[in-house]
Protein backbone atom coordinates (compact mmCIF):
# COMPACT_ATOMS: atom_id res chain seq x y z
CA UNK A 1 0.00 0.00 0.00
CA UNK A 2 1.00 3.66 -0.39
CA UNK A 3 0.07 5.31 2.92
CA UNK A 4 0.45 8.93 1.81
CA UNK A 5 -1.62 8.33 -1.31
CA UNK A 6 -4.31 6.46 0.65
CA UNK A 7 -4.64 9.14 3.35
CA UNK A 8 -4.70 11.98 0.85
CA UNK A 9 -7.41 10.27 -1.18
CA UNK A 10 -9.64 8.78 1.52
CA UNK A 11 -9.00 10.89 4.61
CA UNK A 12 -7.53 14.35 4.09
CA UNK A 13 -8.03 15.16 7.75
CA UNK A 14 -6.28 11.95 8.75
CA UNK A 15 -3.34 12.82 6.55
CA UNK A 16 -3.09 16.31 8.07
CA UNK A 17 -3.29 14.82 11.55
CA UNK A 18 -0.48 12.40 10.78
CA UNK A 19 1.65 15.18 9.31
CA UNK A 20 1.00 17.44 12.33
CA UNK A 21 1.82 14.67 14.76
CA UNK A 22 5.06 13.88 12.92
CA UNK A 23 6.12 17.54 13.20
CA UNK A 24 5.31 17.59 16.92
CA UNK A 25 7.38 14.46 17.39
CA UNK A 26 10.29 16.10 15.62
CA UNK A 27 10.14 18.91 18.22
CA UNK A 28 9.61 16.62 21.20
CA UNK A 29 12.85 14.72 20.70
CA UNK A 30 13.00 13.06 24.10
CA UNK A 31 9.51 11.61 24.13
CA UNK A 32 9.54 10.43 20.52
CA UNK A 33 13.00 8.94 20.79
CA UNK A 34 11.80 6.91 23.75
CA UNK A 35 8.83 5.58 21.78
CA UNK A 36 10.95 4.68 18.72
CA UNK A 37 13.22 2.57 20.91
CA UNK A 38 10.24 0.32 21.68
CA UNK A 39 9.24 -1.03 18.24
CA UNK A 40 6.95 -3.70 19.73
CA UNK A 41 5.06 -1.26 21.92
CA UNK A 42 1.46 -0.45 21.06
CA UNK A 43 2.27 3.04 22.31
CA UNK A 44 4.29 3.64 19.17
CA UNK A 45 1.95 5.71 17.02
CA UNK A 46 4.67 7.32 14.88
CA UNK A 47 5.24 4.30 12.65
CA UNK A 48 5.41 5.10 8.96
CA UNK A 49 5.40 3.25 5.67
CA UNK A 50 8.62 2.99 3.68
CA UNK A 51 9.10 1.90 0.08
CA UNK A 52 11.67 -0.80 0.79
CA UNK A 53 11.03 -4.21 2.37
CA UNK A 54 14.61 -4.89 3.55
CA UNK A 55 17.83 -2.93 4.03
CA UNK A 56 20.52 -5.60 4.23
CA UNK A 57 21.42 -6.22 0.60
CA UNK A 58 25.13 -6.38 -0.22
CA UNK A 59 27.33 -6.07 -3.30
CA UNK A 60 25.12 -6.53 -6.35
CA UNK A 61 22.09 -8.10 -4.64
CA UNK A 62 20.19 -8.74 -7.89
CA UNK A 63 20.77 -9.46 -11.55
CA UNK A 64 18.66 -10.38 -14.56
CA UNK A 65 20.69 -13.51 -15.32
CA UNK A 66 19.99 -15.32 -12.02
CA UNK A 67 16.29 -15.87 -12.40
CA UNK A 68 13.62 -15.99 -11.27
CA UNK A 69 14.46 -14.05 -8.12
CA UNK A 70 10.77 -13.90 -7.25
CA UNK A 71 7.56 -15.84 -7.81
CA UNK A 72 3.89 -14.97 -7.30
CA UNK A 73 1.78 -17.88 -6.06
CA UNK A 74 -1.66 -18.03 -4.41
CA UNK A 75 -1.83 -14.30 -3.70
CA UNK A 76 1.68 -14.11 -2.23
CA UNK A 77 4.84 -12.79 -3.88
CA UNK A 78 8.00 -14.56 -2.72
CA UNK A 79 11.27 -12.69 -3.27
CA UNK A 80 15.00 -13.40 -2.87
CA UNK A 81 18.22 -11.40 -2.91
CA UNK A 82 21.88 -11.47 -1.84
CA UNK A 83 22.31 -10.38 1.77
CA UNK A 84 25.12 -10.29 4.35
CA UNK A 85 28.02 -12.69 3.69
CA UNK A 86 26.46 -13.16 0.22
CA UNK A 87 23.90 -15.50 1.79
CA UNK A 88 20.46 -15.91 0.16
CA UNK A 89 17.64 -14.03 1.92
CA UNK A 90 13.94 -14.65 1.32
CA UNK A 91 10.87 -12.53 2.08
CA UNK A 92 7.20 -12.69 1.10
CA UNK A 93 4.30 -10.28 0.70
CA UNK A 94 0.63 -11.21 1.12
CA UNK A 95 -1.36 -9.04 -1.29
CA UNK A 96 -4.67 -9.61 0.50
CA UNK A 97 -3.53 -8.76 4.04
CA UNK A 98 -0.78 -6.32 3.09
CA UNK A 99 1.64 -8.13 5.40
CA UNK A 100 5.31 -8.87 4.86
CA UNK A 101 7.18 -11.86 6.26
CA UNK A 102 10.94 -12.10 6.62
CA UNK A 103 13.53 -11.72 5.35
CA UNK A 104 14.89 -15.10 6.45
CA UNK A 105 18.28 -16.52 5.59
CA UNK A 106 17.85 -19.63 3.44
CA UNK A 107 21.45 -20.88 3.39
CA UNK A 108 25.12 -20.19 4.00
CA UNK A 109 27.22 -19.16 1.01
CA UNK A 110 30.88 -20.11 0.80
CA UNK A 111 31.50 -17.06 -1.38
CA UNK A 112 31.04 -14.70 1.56
CA UNK A 113 33.44 -16.68 3.72
CA UNK A 114 36.37 -17.17 1.38
CA UNK A 115 39.88 -15.87 2.04
CA UNK A 116 41.32 -13.17 -0.17
CA UNK A 117 39.81 -11.77 -3.34
CA UNK A 118 37.53 -8.78 -3.69
CA UNK A 119 34.99 -7.88 -1.05
CA UNK A 120 31.99 -9.33 -2.88
CA UNK A 121 32.07 -12.01 -5.56
CA UNK A 122 28.40 -11.46 -6.56
CA UNK A 123 28.02 -14.60 -8.69
CA UNK A 124 26.02 -16.69 -6.21
CA UNK A 125 22.83 -14.64 -6.02
CA UNK A 126 19.73 -16.75 -5.28
CA UNK A 127 17.42 -18.23 -7.90
CA UNK A 128 13.95 -19.39 -6.83
CA UNK A 129 11.51 -22.14 -7.81
CA UNK A 130 8.29 -23.47 -6.24
CA UNK A 131 7.61 -27.15 -6.96
CA UNK A 132 4.24 -28.83 -7.46
CA UNK A 133 4.02 -29.69 -3.75
CA UNK A 134 4.55 -26.06 -2.70
CA UNK A 135 8.12 -26.40 -1.45
CA UNK A 136 10.27 -23.37 -2.21
CA UNK A 137 13.71 -24.04 -3.69
CA UNK A 138 16.71 -21.69 -3.69
CA UNK A 139 19.84 -22.26 -5.78
CA UNK A 140 22.79 -20.13 -4.70
CA UNK A 141 26.41 -19.69 -3.68
CA UNK A 142 28.55 -20.73 -6.62
CA UNK A 143 31.16 -19.13 -8.82
CA UNK A 144 32.28 -22.34 -10.46
CA UNK A 145 33.28 -24.31 -7.37
CA UNK A 146 36.85 -24.63 -6.17
CA UNK A 147 39.74 -27.07 -6.29
CA UNK A 148 38.72 -28.62 -2.96
CA UNK A 149 35.56 -29.88 -4.70
CA UNK A 150 37.74 -32.07 -6.93
CA UNK A 151 38.30 -31.92 -10.68
CA UNK A 152 35.63 -30.19 -12.72
CA UNK A 153 34.96 -32.54 -15.66
CA UNK A 154 33.35 -29.80 -17.77
CA UNK A 155 35.55 -26.79 -17.14
CA UNK A 156 37.64 -24.94 -14.59
CA UNK A 157 36.99 -23.66 -11.07
CA UNK A 158 37.08 -20.38 -9.15
CA UNK A 159 35.24 -19.86 -5.84
CA UNK A 160 32.30 -21.01 -3.76
CA UNK A 161 30.05 -24.00 -4.29
CA UNK A 162 26.70 -24.21 -6.03
CA UNK A 163 24.10 -25.16 -3.42
CA UNK A 164 20.42 -26.06 -3.25
CA UNK A 165 18.20 -25.17 -0.28
CA UNK A 166 14.53 -26.09 0.15
CA UNK A 167 11.90 -24.88 2.61
CA UNK A 168 11.07 -27.36 5.36
CA UNK A 169 7.35 -26.85 4.79
CA UNK A 170 5.30 -25.88 1.72
CA UNK A 171 4.95 -22.12 1.18
CA UNK A 172 6.81 -21.44 4.46
CA UNK A 173 9.95 -19.32 4.18
CA UNK A 174 10.94 -19.39 7.85
CA UNK A 175 13.00 -22.61 7.91
CA UNK A 176 15.33 -24.16 5.33
CA UNK A 177 17.56 -27.15 4.73
CA UNK A 178 20.27 -27.85 2.17
CA UNK A 179 19.91 -30.73 -0.28
CA UNK A 180 23.23 -32.09 -1.50
CA UNK A 181 21.93 -33.05 -4.94
CA UNK A 182 23.48 -30.68 -7.51
CA UNK A 183 27.07 -30.31 -8.64
CA UNK A 184 29.13 -27.70 -6.73
CA UNK A 185 30.66 -26.61 -10.06
CA UNK A 186 28.04 -24.05 -10.97
CA UNK A 187 27.13 -20.39 -11.30
CA UNK A 188 24.42 -18.20 -12.92
CA UNK A 189 21.56 -20.50 -11.85
CA UNK A 190 18.31 -20.33 -13.83
CA UNK A 191 15.40 -22.53 -12.71
CA UNK A 192 12.45 -23.59 -14.86
CA UNK A 193 9.44 -25.72 -13.92
CA UNK A 194 7.58 -27.25 -16.82
CA UNK A 195 3.81 -27.82 -16.95
CA UNK A 196 4.26 -31.49 -15.99
CA UNK A 197 6.27 -30.54 -12.90
CA UNK A 198 9.70 -31.45 -14.26
CA UNK A 199 12.41 -29.05 -13.08
CA UNK A 200 15.33 -27.88 -15.22
CA UNK A 201 18.26 -26.09 -13.60
CA UNK A 202 20.46 -24.27 -16.14
CA UNK A 203 23.90 -22.93 -15.21
CA UNK A 204 27.52 -22.63 -16.26
CA UNK A 205 29.42 -25.69 -15.05
CA UNK A 206 32.41 -23.85 -13.56
CA UNK A 207 34.31 -20.62 -14.09
CA UNK A 208 34.77 -18.81 -17.43
CA UNK A 209 36.27 -21.75 -19.30
CA UNK A 210 33.40 -24.18 -18.77
CA UNK A 211 30.41 -25.68 -20.56
CA UNK A 212 26.86 -24.48 -20.01
CA UNK A 213 24.66 -27.34 -18.78
CA UNK A 214 21.30 -28.27 -17.36
CA UNK A 215 20.29 -30.75 -14.67
CA UNK A 216 16.80 -32.27 -14.68
CA UNK A 217 14.60 -33.39 -11.78
CA UNK A 218 11.39 -35.42 -12.10
CA UNK A 219 10.67 -35.67 -8.36
CA UNK A 220 10.15 -32.05 -7.29
CA UNK A 221 13.84 -31.35 -6.94
CA UNK A 222 14.66 -34.14 -4.49
CA UNK A 223 17.10 -35.68 -6.97
CA UNK A 224 18.71 -34.41 -10.17
CA UNK A 225 20.14 -36.26 -13.14
CA UNK A 226 23.75 -35.68 -14.19
CA UNK A 227 24.58 -32.42 -16.01
CA UNK A 228 24.00 -32.30 -19.77
CA UNK A 229 26.20 -29.89 -21.78
CA UNK A 230 24.46 -27.69 -24.36
CA UNK A 231 27.13 -25.01 -25.01
CA UNK A 232 30.74 -26.13 -25.46
CA UNK A 233 33.85 -24.34 -24.22
CA UNK A 234 37.04 -25.16 -26.12
CA UNK A 235 40.46 -23.74 -26.89
CA UNK A 236 40.81 -21.73 -30.07
CA UNK A 237 43.66 -22.44 -32.48
CA UNK A 238 43.70 -19.05 -34.22
CA UNK A 239 44.10 -16.80 -31.17
CA UNK A 240 45.25 -17.19 -27.55
CA UNK A 241 41.80 -17.65 -26.10
CA UNK A 242 39.04 -20.09 -25.19
CA UNK A 243 35.45 -20.11 -26.47
CA UNK A 244 33.03 -19.34 -23.67
CA UNK A 245 29.39 -18.27 -23.30
CA UNK A 246 26.73 -16.48 -21.27
CA UNK A 247 23.18 -17.82 -21.58
CA UNK A 248 19.64 -16.96 -20.49
CA UNK A 249 17.06 -19.78 -20.44
CA UNK A 250 13.32 -19.38 -20.01
CA UNK A 251 10.10 -21.28 -20.55
CA UNK A 252 8.73 -21.10 -24.07
CA UNK A 253 5.47 -22.52 -25.40
CA UNK A 254 4.27 -25.91 -24.20
CA UNK A 255 7.18 -28.28 -23.66
CA UNK A 256 9.80 -25.87 -25.02
CA UNK A 257 12.60 -24.00 -23.28
CA UNK A 258 14.11 -21.03 -25.14
CA UNK A 259 17.73 -19.93 -24.79
CA UNK A 260 19.49 -16.76 -25.90
CA UNK A 261 23.23 -16.26 -25.42
CA UNK A 262 26.27 -14.23 -26.32
CA UNK A 263 29.86 -15.29 -27.01
CA UNK A 264 32.72 -14.62 -24.59
CA UNK A 265 36.21 -14.62 -26.02
CA UNK A 266 38.14 -15.69 -22.92
CA UNK A 267 41.64 -14.32 -23.56
CA UNK A 268 44.80 -15.73 -22.02
CA UNK A 269 46.83 -13.47 -19.74
CA UNK A 270 48.65 -10.80 -21.75
CA UNK A 271 46.67 -11.55 -24.91
CA UNK A 272 43.66 -9.81 -26.38
CA UNK A 273 42.99 -6.19 -27.23
CA UNK A 274 46.06 -4.09 -26.36
CA UNK A 275 47.38 -7.00 -24.32
CA UNK A 276 44.71 -6.50 -21.66
CA UNK A 277 44.44 -10.24 -21.07
CA UNK A 278 41.25 -11.59 -19.58
CA UNK A 279 38.44 -9.07 -19.84
CA UNK A 280 34.66 -9.34 -20.13
CA UNK A 281 34.84 -9.10 -23.92
CA UNK A 282 31.65 -10.60 -25.35
CA UNK A 283 30.00 -10.31 -28.75
CA UNK A 284 26.96 -11.25 -30.84
CA UNK A 285 23.53 -12.65 -29.99
CA UNK A 286 22.30 -16.21 -30.52
CA UNK A 287 19.06 -18.14 -30.07
CA UNK A 288 17.93 -21.78 -29.93
CA UNK A 289 15.18 -23.85 -28.32
CA UNK A 290 14.91 -27.15 -26.46
CA UNK A 291 11.91 -29.48 -26.82
CA UNK A 292 11.90 -31.18 -23.43
CA UNK A 293 9.42 -33.82 -24.60
CA UNK A 294 11.52 -35.08 -27.52
CA UNK A 295 14.92 -34.01 -26.16
CA UNK A 296 15.71 -32.22 -29.42
CA UNK A 297 17.38 -28.83 -29.76
CA UNK A 298 16.80 -26.62 -32.81
CA UNK A 299 17.43 -23.16 -34.19
CA UNK A 300 14.72 -20.59 -34.88
CA UNK A 301 13.92 -22.19 -38.26
CA UNK A 302 13.49 -25.66 -36.76
CA UNK A 303 16.82 -27.10 -37.91
CA UNK A 304 18.05 -29.74 -35.44
CA UNK A 305 21.23 -29.14 -33.46
CA UNK A 306 23.72 -31.62 -32.03
CA UNK A 307 24.85 -30.99 -28.45
CA UNK A 308 26.97 -29.47 -27.17
CA UNK A 309 26.82 -26.55 -29.59
CA UNK A 310 30.25 -25.19 -30.54
CA UNK A 311 31.18 -21.68 -31.67
CA UNK A 312 31.34 -22.79 -35.29
CA UNK A 313 27.85 -24.32 -35.17
CA UNK A 314 26.47 -21.36 -33.23
CA UNK A 315 27.81 -18.89 -35.79
CA UNK A 316 26.39 -20.88 -38.70
CA UNK A 317 23.02 -21.95 -37.33
CA UNK A 318 21.93 -19.91 -34.28
CA UNK A 319 23.18 -16.36 -34.90
CA UNK A 320 20.56 -13.68 -34.27
CA UNK A 321 22.70 -10.56 -34.59
CA UNK A 322 26.33 -9.67 -35.19
CA UNK A 323 27.41 -6.84 -32.90
CA UNK A 324 30.71 -6.07 -34.61
CA UNK A 325 33.04 -4.08 -32.39
CA UNK A 326 30.37 -3.53 -29.73
CA UNK A 327 30.86 -5.51 -26.53
CA UNK A 328 27.78 -7.25 -25.14
CA UNK A 329 26.15 -8.29 -21.88
CA UNK A 330 23.31 -10.76 -22.32
CA UNK A 331 19.71 -10.11 -21.34
CA UNK A 332 16.43 -12.02 -21.38
CA UNK A 333 14.38 -13.68 -24.13
CA UNK A 334 10.60 -14.05 -24.46
CA UNK A 335 8.06 -15.13 -27.07
CA UNK A 336 5.33 -12.96 -28.54
CA UNK A 337 1.73 -14.11 -29.05
CA UNK A 338 2.70 -15.67 -32.39
CA UNK A 339 5.44 -17.73 -30.76
CA UNK A 340 8.27 -15.66 -32.27
CA UNK A 341 11.32 -14.95 -30.08
CA UNK A 342 12.42 -11.51 -28.90
CA UNK A 343 15.77 -10.88 -27.21
CA UNK A 344 17.12 -8.13 -24.97
CA UNK A 345 20.84 -7.59 -25.44
CA UNK A 346 23.02 -4.92 -23.82
CA UNK A 347 25.78 -3.61 -26.07
CA UNK A 348 28.25 -0.74 -25.98
CA UNK A 349 31.54 0.65 -27.23
CA UNK A 350 34.84 -0.68 -25.87
CA UNK A 351 36.41 2.27 -24.05
CA UNK A 352 39.45 0.43 -22.77
CA UNK A 353 38.14 -0.65 -19.37
CA UNK A 354 38.28 -4.25 -18.17
CA UNK A 355 34.54 -4.38 -18.86
CA UNK A 356 34.93 -2.50 -22.14
CA UNK A 357 32.54 0.33 -21.38
CA UNK A 358 28.90 1.16 -20.60
CA UNK A 359 26.34 -1.02 -22.38
CA UNK A 360 22.82 -0.02 -23.36
CA UNK A 361 19.77 -2.28 -23.68
CA UNK A 362 18.71 -3.07 -27.26
CA UNK A 363 15.89 -5.13 -28.73
CA UNK A 364 16.19 -7.89 -31.33
CA UNK A 365 13.34 -10.03 -32.69
CA UNK A 366 12.54 -12.73 -35.24
CA UNK A 367 9.79 -11.55 -37.62
CA UNK A 368 9.09 -14.99 -39.07
CA UNK A 369 11.66 -14.63 -41.84
CA UNK A 370 14.71 -12.91 -40.38
CA UNK A 371 16.19 -11.33 -37.29
CA UNK A 372 15.58 -7.57 -37.12
CA UNK A 373 16.27 -4.71 -34.71
CA UNK A 374 19.22 -3.97 -32.49
CA UNK A 375 18.48 -0.31 -31.78
CA UNK A 376 18.65 1.11 -28.27
CA UNK A 377 15.55 1.09 -26.11
CA UNK A 378 16.58 4.51 -24.76
CA UNK A 379 17.58 6.56 -27.83
CA UNK A 380 20.84 8.53 -27.71
CA UNK A 381 21.63 7.19 -24.23
CA UNK A 382 25.31 6.33 -23.65
CA UNK A 383 25.49 5.24 -20.01
CA UNK A 384 24.54 1.88 -18.48
CA UNK A 385 20.97 0.63 -18.84
CA UNK A 386 19.37 -2.71 -18.00
CA UNK A 387 15.82 -3.97 -18.39
CA UNK A 388 13.44 -6.84 -18.89
CA UNK A 389 10.50 -6.77 -21.27
CA UNK A 390 6.97 -7.98 -21.92
CA UNK A 391 5.68 -8.63 -25.42
CA UNK A 392 2.15 -9.38 -26.63
CA UNK A 393 1.72 -9.15 -30.39
CA UNK A 394 5.01 -8.65 -32.27
CA UNK A 395 4.58 -4.90 -32.50
CA UNK A 396 3.80 -4.12 -28.85
CA UNK A 397 6.78 -4.33 -26.51
CA UNK A 398 7.17 -2.89 -23.00
CA UNK A 399 10.51 -2.60 -21.21
CA UNK A 400 10.90 -1.86 -17.52
CA UNK A 401 14.35 -0.31 -17.67
CA UNK A 402 16.78 1.25 -15.23
CA UNK A 403 19.13 4.04 -16.23
CA UNK A 404 20.73 7.12 -14.69
CA UNK A 405 19.64 10.69 -15.26
CA UNK A 406 22.27 13.08 -13.96
CA UNK A 407 23.04 11.49 -10.56
CA UNK A 408 19.62 9.92 -10.08
CA UNK A 409 18.67 6.28 -10.55
CA UNK A 410 15.50 5.88 -12.61
CA UNK A 411 13.30 2.86 -13.29
CA UNK A 412 10.68 3.52 -15.95
CA UNK A 413 8.52 1.89 -18.61
CA UNK A 414 9.47 2.25 -22.27
CA UNK A 415 6.87 1.37 -24.90
CA UNK A 416 7.16 0.40 -28.57
CA UNK A 417 4.24 -0.01 -30.98
CA UNK A 418 6.35 -0.73 -34.07
CA UNK A 419 8.17 -3.92 -33.15
CA UNK A 420 11.05 -2.26 -31.33
CA UNK A 421 12.11 0.26 -33.97
CA UNK A 422 11.24 3.14 -31.66
CA UNK A 423 10.64 3.29 -27.91
CA UNK A 424 9.02 6.11 -25.94
CA UNK A 425 9.28 6.56 -22.18
CA UNK A 426 5.94 6.04 -20.48
CA UNK A 427 5.90 6.41 -16.70
CA UNK A 428 8.51 6.30 -13.96
CA UNK A 429 8.09 3.57 -11.35
CA UNK A 430 10.97 4.45 -9.01
CA UNK A 431 13.50 7.26 -8.75
CA UNK A 432 16.23 7.82 -6.15
CA UNK A 433 18.77 10.61 -5.76
CA UNK A 434 22.50 9.93 -5.94
CA UNK A 435 22.15 6.19 -6.48
CA UNK A 436 22.09 3.45 -9.07
CA UNK A 437 19.73 0.49 -9.36
CA UNK A 438 20.36 -3.22 -9.73
CA UNK A 439 17.28 -5.09 -10.93
CA UNK A 440 15.98 -8.62 -11.29
CA UNK A 441 14.23 -10.17 -14.25
CA UNK A 442 10.45 -9.99 -14.05
CA UNK A 443 8.93 -11.97 -11.21
CA UNK A 444 7.46 -15.25 -12.41
CA UNK A 445 3.66 -15.09 -12.80
CA UNK A 446 3.77 -11.50 -11.56
CA UNK A 447 0.67 -9.42 -10.94
CA UNK A 448 0.63 -5.68 -11.81
CA UNK A 449 1.26 -4.63 -8.20
CA UNK A 450 4.54 -6.56 -7.90
CA UNK A 451 6.60 -7.16 -11.04
CA UNK A 452 10.29 -6.66 -10.34
CA UNK A 453 12.88 -6.44 -7.55
CA UNK A 454 15.13 -3.39 -7.27
CA UNK A 455 18.23 -2.73 -5.17
CA UNK A 456 19.08 0.90 -4.41
CA UNK A 457 22.88 1.06 -4.55
CA UNK A 458 24.33 3.95 -2.60
CA UNK A 459 27.07 1.83 -1.03
CA UNK A 460 27.89 -1.88 -1.18
CA UNK A 461 26.29 -2.79 2.17
CA UNK A 462 23.01 -1.96 3.87
CA UNK A 463 21.34 -1.81 0.47
CA UNK A 464 17.61 -1.12 0.40
CA UNK A 465 15.51 -3.68 -1.46
CA UNK A 466 12.26 -2.80 -3.26
CA UNK A 467 9.38 -4.77 -4.75
CA UNK A 468 7.86 -2.61 -7.49
CA UNK A 469 4.81 -2.77 -9.72
CA UNK A 470 2.88 -0.53 -12.08
CA UNK A 471 2.18 2.05 -9.38
CA UNK A 472 5.57 2.04 -7.68
CA UNK A 473 6.99 0.28 -4.65
CA UNK A 474 5.06 -2.03 -2.35
CA UNK A 475 5.44 -0.40 1.06
CA UNK A 476 6.17 -1.80 4.50
CA UNK A 477 5.77 -0.55 8.05
CA UNK A 478 9.14 0.71 9.27
CA UNK A 479 8.54 -0.76 12.71
CA UNK A 480 7.62 -4.10 11.15
CA UNK A 481 10.75 -3.99 9.00
CA UNK A 482 13.08 -3.19 11.91
CA UNK A 483 11.51 -5.93 14.00
CA UNK A 484 11.80 -8.48 11.20
CA UNK A 485 15.35 -7.78 10.01
CA UNK A 486 17.65 -10.65 11.03
CA UNK A 487 21.12 -10.27 12.47
CA UNK A 488 23.81 -11.78 10.25
CA UNK A 489 26.26 -14.34 11.61
Swiss-Prot record:
E.C. number: 4.2.2.-
Active site: 123, 188
Gene Ontology terms: cellular component: plasma membrane
Major location category of this protein: membrane
N-palmitoyl cysteine lipid sites: 32
Lipid-substituted positions (S-diacylglycerol cysteine): 32
Keywords in alphabetical order: Cell membrane, Lipoprotein, Lyase, Membrane, Metal-binding, Palmitate, Signal, Zinc
Pfam families reported in the protein's UniProt record: BNR_4
Places the protein is found: Cell membrane
PROSITE patterns given in the database record: PROKAR_LIPOPROTEIN (PS51257)
Positions that bind Zn(2+): 208, 264, 266, 278
SUPFAM superfamilies, per the entry: Sialidases
Positions bearing the site annotation: Neutralizes the sugar carboxylate group at subsite +1: 204
Keyword DNA repair: no
Function: Ulvan lyase involved in ulvan degradation. Ulvan is the main polysaccharide component of the Ulvales (green seaweed) cell wall. It is composed of disaccharide building blocks comprising 3-sulfated rhamnose (Rha3S) linked to D-glucuronic acid (GlcA), L-iduronic acid (IduA), or D-xylose (Xyl). Ulvan lyase catalyzes the endolytic cleavage of the glycosidic bond between Rha3S and the uronic acids GlcA or IduA, producing oligosaccharides that have unsaturated 4-deoxy-L-threo-hex-4-enopyranosiduronic acid (deltaUA) at the non-reducing end.
Protein family: Belongs to the polysaccharide lyase 25 family.
Record-given protein name: Ulvan Lyase-PL25
